[in-house]
Amino acid sequence: MESMKQLKNHNVDLISNNDPLDKNRLLIEDLWESVLREECPNDQANRLMKLKELSYCNQVEEDISRTFKNEIVDIVNSMDLAESISAARAFSLYFQLVNILEQRVEEDRYIQSFTNKNNQKSHDNLDPFAPALARQNAPVTFRELFYRLRKLNVPPGKLEELLQEMDIRLVFTAHPTEIVRHTIRHKQTRVANLLQKIQVEKFLTVEDIKSLKIQLKEEIRLWWRTDELHQFKPSVIDEVDYALHYFQQVLFNAMPQLRGRISSALTENYPDVQMPTESFCTFGSWVGSDRDGNPSVTPEITWRTACYQRKLMLERYISATSNLRDQLSVSMQWSQVSSSLLESLETDRVQFPEIYEARATRYRSEPYRLKLSYILEKLRLTKERNNLLAEAGWKFSLERESDNKNIELVEKLHYRSVDEFTYDLELIKNSLNSTDLTCEAVSKLLTQVHIFGFSLASLDIRQESTRHSDAIQELTNYLELPKKYDQMPEIERIEWLKDELNTKRPLIPAEVSWTKSTEETFSVFKMVKRLQEEFGSRICHSYVISMSHSASDLLEVLLLAKEMGLIDQSSQKSKLLVVPLFETVEDLKRAPEVMEQLFQLDFYRSLLPKVGERFKPIQELMLGYSDSNKDSGFLSSNWEIHRAQIALQNLSSKNNILLRLFHGRGGSVGRGGGPAYQAILAQPSGTLKGRIKITEQGEVLASKYSLPELALYNLETVTTAVIQNSLVINRLDATPEWNDLMTRLAETSRIQYRKLVHENPNLLTFFQEVTPIEEISKLQISSRPARRKKGAKDLSSLRAIPWVFGWTQSRFLLPSWFGVGTALSVELKSDPEQIELLRVLHQRWPFFRMLISKVEMTLSKVDLEVAKYYVDTLGSKENAKSFGDIFDVISKEYNLTKSLVLEITGKNKLLESDRDLRLSVNLRNKTIIPLGFLQVSLLRRLRDQTRQPPISEFLNERNESERAYSRSELLRGALLTINGIAAGMRNTG
């Protein structure tokens, strides 16, 4: 067997000394090996290196060598429990280091794109529209995009109109939760920063480089001695803290930079075009407000989340204002000051005499510093008041409690709204401008205030539709309606709900004891009203109804909102935007009919918020990728979502209503994930119009927002794609022949998928036995249960996230591709000439190209050799025949799909046209093999113990204690392999 160094040399065709990724990968691997040799016993370290060498052998060979695979299995099976855990930790560490390295390289390449400012000629032939659009794989910068638009003679007025209407909303979610501990994330950031310093080695001395490598090794050794697993199940507030970390550390400062890059690109290419508003891109969050299937998210938790968000923003503003006070040392002896600012100082002196006494002498000739001292005091008081409210809870109001011992704090002048804070900052900015001075820090802070306000991110409430209908059912039972609500057909329900919405009479009687579920449903609406009273409507104005099936689902929420004071009947205005979430394929097909029923109701239209210069009503509508995929498979899900968007946009236009589509995309392809740029470009032409809302799932937050330039890259990618798609007149989506073909493909794919997943009685048992789904549920990574209903074991109760997670761990990745091959094959059997049409679609239609690209990428990660090992080793003997049949179906579909995808793309290998991605996937595919075999070994031992009779029948008390500890450690080892494979595959669910 060759040594690792010899194997690295044998792999020279894949490594370029000039490629920073390859160069630094060798550095990372050397450090990884060095740390393991220092931290592990010598024979154990040798076996780990042997596993790594065998992985390299597999990487060099085109196909997995059975000899090498058997050697890996032999080594894994020879390991005792402690060594297995060390091996799982070692390979998990390796993949996390590789992930850091790839992120750093992505960040550097993005930065380099700004240094190639004069290389415009290379872009001249790249047409962002029509057929050439589909051939663009790499995202573009603002500068590149505006340059191309100018070359294509896109009128400045058309671009400006779009920019002024642009409304991009990115919504952070907790689930699927990031599997890596927050503690480990901090270590990863430090490693990334050290790598960044090493990468500029041409500016460093030999001693500097040596010192940095020593620091890097020290950090990795500390990491090795840190527990990777969460020690406790995170609370919802823990999840809130995790998500808000990215706002604190990265996004707060990144957003003004994003705006600056747009400004620079416009000045260069469209100097007369007005900038978009500061809030063209804002943020939302479901963390702490998404209560669908999560009983831990209570009204109190949502209230605490809002207070926590405001606390973080106030702390950032206090810090920024303090820095401004240090900077703005302008003296009245050398500069004029606006009369408005001087008048405000006089008002502040009266309202804050203690600040005047403390600061007036020091700042008697420095008005900006004095003004900022008053601002700091107001911010401090606002923060103290916020802390009191967080402790008191949502049912408590400081203003209403006259006996509150801290009432004197309220009587002082805190900021009652972010507008008051903005006004004070504008006074400073305008005064500086009036004397021909500017201050970038003031402008930056104002931009941050416009984007984040005091609330940081809007909290979307989400709840499942039956919770509302159950509450109204209980209410109407109490009221003794002539006909029970649940017995009314849909038309009757709509009429009854409409009548109740139009009456001023209260429906819900006071002082009635409701069931716990109904009482909490009512309390959510009461809490939202209190939130808006305290924070303003910005904090919480969207209510997402998951599993929306009918018009009554939306009207029920509106009725509850009306009863809790969230609808002003006199003005016909609602303080809550009701957002249906259509998730299953059948619901997606029915969505246009449901919305048309609602749009025909005058009172419903009047309740829609009005936006834009034309003051038109807007409807937000969410499309679910996860459950539609789990329901009908990848191809059917994507096509029905595509068709629904077109139908809904046509319906909205007909009714003179604006549409904002909310895409519930996950991190994995099986849940709508994939490159954001290609996904947005593939949206049907005419459906965006500058407006889009997208979920940013917990598992992808680190890969997108952990580093400043990565965050800017992602934000710029999304924005340029929205601009590009919105300005495209792409008539390819309306090609009848293409639509008919896609409809046939989607239906055939759906039938094949459902035949395996929903109609095969052995599939659920197969999934439970040959994937680590049960062990995944024991990972302490999420506050939300893996199943919608407690105790349920059926497929319908299993959430889409663990469904995808389980298939990914066992290397099937089935939800992301199964059924595609059969659909293509059936079409080509009926007409072999269709292959040419499919190739045309791949070349010219962004939607179809995106589909094939996602399938191709997913297929490249599938490893049926490893998957078969899961089946053979973990499957029970009594199910061997049925499991073998299922595997044969999956294997046949995989080979069929792979061959037809290659036939459509015209390539010989998967990912042949994307070298960087191919090398990354190949590296991971081979190096992850030992982890898969380790996982199987640990799962087998764990499950064997679990299946044995009660231990007390055979062992004394002492041995029982040892046996229990061993079972716990086996689970720990299995969970560590789950961590490692998730890092290697770069996603969970």
UniProtKB/Swiss-Prot annotation:
Gene3D superfamilies named in the record: Phosphoenolpyruvate/pyruvate domain (1.20.1440.90)
Task of the protein: Forms oxaloacetate, a four-carbon dicarboxylic acid source for the tricarboxylic acid cycle.
GO terms for biological process, alphabetical: carbon fixation; oxaloacetate metabolic process; tricarboxylic acid cycle
GO molecular function, a single term: magnesium ion binding
UniProt-recorded name of the protein: Phosphoenolpyruvate carboxylase
UniProt feature coiled coil, ranges: none
Protein family (similarity comment): Belongs to the PEPCase type 1 family.
PANTHER family linked: PHOSPHOENOLPYRUVATE CARBOXYLASE
Keywords: Carbon dioxide fixation, Lyase, Magnesium
NCBIfam families recorded: PRK00009.1
Catalytic activity: oxaloacetate + phosphate = phosphoenolpyruvate + hydrogencarbonate
InterPro entries reported in the protein's UniProt record: PEP_COase, PEP_COase_bac/pln-type, PEP_COase_Lys_AS, PEPCASE_His_AS, Pyrv/PenolPyrv_kinase-like_dom
Listed cofactors: Mg(2+)
Active site: H175, K630
Gene: ppc
EC code(s) of this entry: 4.1.1.31
Lineage per the UniProt record: Bacteria, Bacillati, Cyanobacteriota, Cyanophyceae, Synechococcales
Assigned GO CC terms: cytosol
